[in-house]
């Protein structure tokens, strides 16, 4: 399995197997406590994937859990940066996604971004989250969870 560095720390309730949760090939189901989701509370997910050798890459995706009743919202943006040395990164893609709307049913959503093919050893993936729950939520202004799986 390729090494994954968590540049932001997941919430203690949703750490499970750490960064390997994002690349172990096991997708999360609707039970977000199953150990197949990694969760961030009020902060963006920022991880670096080491491919061990330079490889061509042209897309990245993450699956996010949507469960507004439990204050679990998807990513609002996905940024991808690449590097040959793991220190100097350059952005190759950035995509925004809509904030989850009131009444959205519980589901898993695939957020992806495609870009011109690049060769890189390291890939930094940043999943941006809504900083606070929207006005329509029962806890407006509070922090929210963003749960991700591969």
Question: What spans do the regions from the language model cover?
Answer:
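Aromatic, loop-rich ligand-recognition surfaces of beta-strand-rich domains
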Residues: 28-93, 107-150
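Surface-exposed loop and turn segments in beta-propeller and other repeat-based domains
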Residues: 97-103
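Predominantly extracellular/luminal regions of secreted and cell-surface proteins
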Residues: 1-28
């Amino acid at each position: 399995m390729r090494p994954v560095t968590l540049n932001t720390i997941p919430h203690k309730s949703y750490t499970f197997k750490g960064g390997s949760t994002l690349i172990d090939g096991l997708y999360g189901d609707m039970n977000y406590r199953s150990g197949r989701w990694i969760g961030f509370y009020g902060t963006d997910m920022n991880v670096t994937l080491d491919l061990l050798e330079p490889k061509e890459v042209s897309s990245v995706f993450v699956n996010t859990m949507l469960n507004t009743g439990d204050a679990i919202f998807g990513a609002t943006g996905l940024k991808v940066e690449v590097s040959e040395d793991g220190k100097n990164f350059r952005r190759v893609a950035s995509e925004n996604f809509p904030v989850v709307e009131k009444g959205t049913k519980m589901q898993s959503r695939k957020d992806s971004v495609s870009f011109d093919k690049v060769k890189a050893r390291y890939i930094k993936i940043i999943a941006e989250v809504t900083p606070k729950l929207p006005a329509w939520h029962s806890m407006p202004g509070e922090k929210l969870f963003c749960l991700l799986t591969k």
